[in-house]
């Protein structure tokens, strides 16, 4: 099992759309120095979010990308990439700065809008992770079928995202088991502790 720490991205939703420079640098160093192997950071709404939808963060995408440069190669470092906020140069920009991955995100059932985004990420030479946001919009079997389609599009790893944070452990298990039976790529689970069930 691997753990992705996305505090510096998803956690930034609490503050607005991102953490300031000093805190981002400090947390990135701390995560890397403590052996966290996969880290997602940057604008909470994803790379390109400011240009596409005005999601203002303390730093621009370029500034977030540059501040991580001393840590490139010491962990898998990447950013979120909402499919609805596609910009043709986002993936190349991420790759040019040494990021390991972009995690494409779209609501469950919306895989068709993600194809060009996934292709752009893959063409840039970095990994395309994928988050099935609001996974509960589909049944476990329906979501697993969508994951199979996404795997065929070239996705390297896929995440079941419980965006509302209401899934109980058995429900989460059903989604994971159904998906593992359909795909050959790693399957992840992204939850929120709204029910107080986290360990």
Listing of model-derived features with the role each one plays in the protein:
Residues 49-79, 117-135, 173-189:
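Alpha-helix-loop-beta-strand connector modules within alpha/beta enzyme cores
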Residues 3-10, 39-41, 75-82, 100-104, ...:
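Hydrophobic faces of well-ordered beta-strands that scaffold small-molecule active sites
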Residues 33-36, 99, 155, 184:
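A structural motif
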Residues 157, 161-199:
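Catalytic alpha/beta core domains of metabolic enzymes, predominantly
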Residues 88-94, 138-150, 195-199:
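Catalytic cores of alpha/beta
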Residues 110-164:
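Conserved anion-binding
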Residues 37-64, 103-112, 160-170:
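Glycine-rich, proline-tolerant flexible connector loops at the mouths of alpha/beta enzymes
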Residues 1-6, 28-47:
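N-terminal glycine-rich anion-binding loops that anchor highly charged ligand groups
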């Amino acid at each position: 099992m691997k753990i992705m720490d996305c505090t510096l991205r998803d956690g930034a939703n609490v503050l607005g759309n991102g953490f300031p420079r000093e805190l981002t640098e400090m947390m990135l160093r701390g995560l890397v120095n403590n052996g966290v192997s996969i880290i997602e950071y940057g604008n909470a709404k994803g790379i390109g979010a400011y240009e596409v939808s005005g999601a203002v963060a303390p730093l621009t995408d370029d500034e977030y990308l540059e501040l991580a440069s001393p840590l490139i190669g010491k962990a898998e470092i990447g950013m979120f990439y909402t499919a609805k906020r596609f910009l043709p140069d986002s993936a190349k920009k991420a790759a040019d700065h040494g990021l390991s991955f972009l995690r494409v995100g779209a609501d469950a059932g919306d895989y068709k809008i993600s194809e060009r985004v996934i292709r752009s990420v893959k063409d840039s030479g970095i990994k395309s992770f994928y988050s099935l946001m609001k996974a509960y919009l589909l049944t476990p079997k329906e979501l697993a079928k969508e994951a199979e389609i996404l795997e065929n599009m070239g996705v390297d790893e896929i995440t079941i995202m419980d965006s509302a944070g209401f899934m109980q452990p058995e429900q989460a298990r059903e989604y994971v088991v159904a998906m593992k039976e359909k795909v050959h790529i790693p399957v992840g689970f992204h939850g929120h502790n709204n029910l107080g069930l986290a360990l």
